[in-house]
Amino acid sequence: MVTVYILYSKKADRYYIGQTSELENRLRRHNRGGSSYTKSGTPWKLVYREKFETRSEAMKREKKLKNAKNLEYIKRVIHSSRNELKSE
């Protein structure tokens, strides 16, 4: 399984979109400053998660989210029924 995720940094007031097969490890790396793009925004909070069977499917979804470049669209996605965090 591959997960597309959205992180939010209150400190930086911005979102980060990514995909990984190891979500917990990836989130730890983001919060330890292991990614140059997210380093300045720690701590990051996981606000959206959606799982896919293949890397190809996940990459398509990630690209669609990243290309949106519309904050309102990203917020709607976070609050949508596709967000697997809502079912926990």
Spell out what each predicted region is:
Residues 1-43, 49-52, 59-71, 76-88:
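GIY-YIG nuclease catalytic motif and its immediate N-terminal context
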